[in-house]
Amino acid sequence: IWRQVVIAALLAGGSFTVAANPPPPPPVSYGVEEDVFHPVRARQGMVASVDALATRVGVDILRQGGNAVDAAVAVGYALAVTHPQAGNIGGGGFMMLRTKDGKTTAIDFREMAPEQATRDMFLDDQGNPDSKKSLTSHLASGTPGSVAGFSLALEKYGTMPLNKVIRPAIKLAEEGFIVNDALADDLKTYGSEVIPQHENSKAIFWKNGEPLKKGDRLVQKNLGKSLELIAERGPDAFYKGAIADQIANEMKKHGGLITKAD
């Protein structure tokens, strides 16, 4: 987990229609100057995220008659594929929404510290903060909340089933997508330190002995399978099934604290 993901949904509870010929999204993502300080206005609905592919997923959901929460959850799962730096299902976040009756609700599904976490677990033997422990080790991982938060929001405020809104993310994971500047830069800057230590991650995000570059295709078959399980069985597939077993085993093997009980 590199950073947290925050997804906001506005004006939930009503269906949106999108203009027949909306302007095409800019072919850039965050970190590129061209997508900064260029406001866009819309009357019926709007989707914004850190990644253009994920944003298009949300727009498609609105076009199909979904509401803002349907779109937000679809975007959240799409970001789990297209923005692995922060949008992954191993993380957590927040959702703030305003229903058509004017009520504002906040859903907190931020990661929680595992039960075995202690106050001093990020200190070295001399009692000094150890940034590697707190940022890149298995100790740095909190119990994920994204899958539970998405499901809660969709159940209470959405209009579409999970199997439908998660489907675009599954397709992106299985078929892959072209790595953009932002992802390539982050894989080089952040991933070069962490990813080589984990063979499974290296097999996904590296090619020919180095991080994927802009223009390479990123395919995540295993993530697609995990998302398919969630689509079929809901959040229990993540927190109680084989996925939970694999997370717990990985943590135990590498000194992490998350257990299946968490």
Provide a role label for each language-model segment.
Residues 1-6:
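Bacterial N-terminal signal peptides that target proteins for export
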Residues 9-18:
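Hydrophobic h-region of N-terminal signal peptides that target proteins for export
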Residues 21-56, 68-69, 73-233, 238-240, ...:
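Noncatalytic scaffold domains of N-terminal-nucleophile
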